[in-house]
Amino acid sequence: MHVTVGELIGNFILITGSFILLLVLIKKFAWSNITGIFEERAEKIASDIDRAEEARQKAEVLAQKREDELAGSRKEAKTIIENAKETAEQSKANILADAKLEAGHLKEKANQEIAQNKVEALQSVKGEVADLTISLAGKIISQNLDSHAHKALIDQYIDQLGEA
């Protein structure tokens, strides 16, 4: 199959003309629709990118806000713990001071009671010794004793004193 140069040029002109006609028809009837679709698609992509950027920024803001709140909560918890420790230390100091004061009062009261009991015991013993001395002196005077009888009488009264 031989193709001549004239046929080739004719085919070339026909194909080129058909292509130009196709471009003109596309430009007249479909080009605005095609470019509209591409523009809508480009706008949608740009809008999606903008929304994604806004969402990322909001997420960063929320993350920072949560981080700040967490730091604030930690600081507040630390303050509460420190206040509780201070309150506990103050309570401990107050309780110890009250206990020492109460112990001092109890010790002082016990010492006073001991001193009072000692004074009462001494007065009682002095009274009994005085009574015994008077009684013994009366018996000695009423009885004229020799030294041996005198010693026996004193021993007898000492034994009675020990039993009382």
UniProtKB/Swiss-Prot annotation:
A cellular-component GO term for this protein: plasma membrane
Protein origin, superkingdom: Bacteria
Residues annotated as transmembrane: 6-26
SUPFAM superfamilies referenced in this protein's UniProt entry, alphabetically: F1F0 ATP synthase subunit B, membrane domain (SSF81573)
Keywords: ATP synthesis, Cell membrane, CF(0), Hydrogen ion transport, Ion transport, Membrane, Transmembrane, Transmembrane helix, Transport
Induction: Induced by a decrease in external pH from 7.5 to 5.7.
Subcellular location: Cell membrane
Position of the signal peptide: none
Any Pfam family the entry gives: ATP-synt_B
Subunit record text: F-type ATPases have 2 components, F(1) - the catalytic core - and F(0) - the membrane proton channel. F(1) has five subunits: alpha(3), beta(3), gamma(1), delta(1), epsilon(1). F(0) has three main subunits: a(1), b(2) and c(10-14). The alpha and beta chains form an alternating ring which encloses part of the gamma chain. F(1) is attached to F(0) by a central stalk formed by the gamma and epsilon chains, while a peripheral stalk is formed by the delta and b chains.
Family in the record: Belongs to the ATPase B chain family.
Record's protein name: ATP synthase subunit b
The organism of origin for this protein: Streptococcus pneumoniae (strain ATCC BAA-255 / R6)
Gene that encodes the chain: atpF
